[in-house]
Amino acid sequence: TLIILGLAGGSIYIFPYLKYVFYDPLIQVLHISDTQSGLLLTMYAIGCVILYIPGGILADKTNPKKALMLSLAVATILTGAFAVTILLDLPGSVAYGISLVIWLLIAFASGFVFWTAILKAIRIIGTEEEQGTMYGIYYAANGTTAAIIAAVNLWAYNAGGGDSNMKSGFFWAVVSMAAFTLLATILIAIFLEGKSDKDLSTAEEDKFHFGDVVTVLKNPAVWMISVVFFCVYGVYSCSSYFTPYLTDIVKLSTTAAGVCAILRQYIVMLVAAPLGGIL
């Protein structure tokens, strides 16, 4: 079950961050600028910022199995819609406008109730004493499946035409992304235990109360950690531009640059995450 949850977490975030591996295909197929590609992620970030808190509140009242299935199904539909946008070869402004809407809506799939539902599902699988082990297995499965999915996406890009037929290759790469979120939806429907809403209800002391917001905002540690995360994520986001550097300056192919991106983003994380936990 934890491996399936890892597949869900590893697959749903591939699409909104696809430019980390497929930077040049995204730019060239949509006929957009570097700034416009950045705005896609900005739309996604805005949606996530707005939705995380209400999503967490709603997750307290929602069965995690239903929430995960709905989130993954919506992600599959939106990823498929983007693939169709590529296939239709729409005018640049139209295709880009549709893409902005898709990136905003994908926040509903991955940033609304999904993340909290994943945490809730992991929590109910094991006992209180097993939580550390449960999360460790989940994150290992998450990183491993994300690396495998990204590699399959890159294979689909090459099989579909690669740099010689970038539109076709990019289309099949996006289709493969949708296939994995669909697979995760089916596996969760089959294997994740669907406990009753009564069994999954959150204890009163653990539920969200608006008065807690004031308490949290008064805590200096919260602001300090927020600044740290902001800085770290800023560096992480900027690392996406290492991919076009490899293709434009170093003159690597999209495939070779994609392999470097997968190594940087997923494989290194598999080593760095547990090492960081030890340190």
Task: Label each region the model flagged.
Residues K19-D24, N142, A150, P220-I262, ...:
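Extracytoplasmic gate region of multi-pass secondary transporters
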Residues L39-I57, L263-L275:
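Central cavity-lining transmembrane alpha-helices of secondary-active solute carriers
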Residues A73-S93:
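C-terminal ends and interior cores of transmembrane alpha-helices
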Residues I102-A141:
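Cytoplasmic helix-loop-helix junction between adjacent transmembrane helices
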Residues G132-N158:
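Glycine-rich segments within core transmembrane alpha-helices of 12-TM secondary carriers
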Residues F170-I190:
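Symmetry-related core transmembrane helices of the 12-TM Major Facilitator Superfamily/SLC fold
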Residues A189-G211:
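Flexible cytoplasmic inter-helical loops of multi-pass small-molecule transporters
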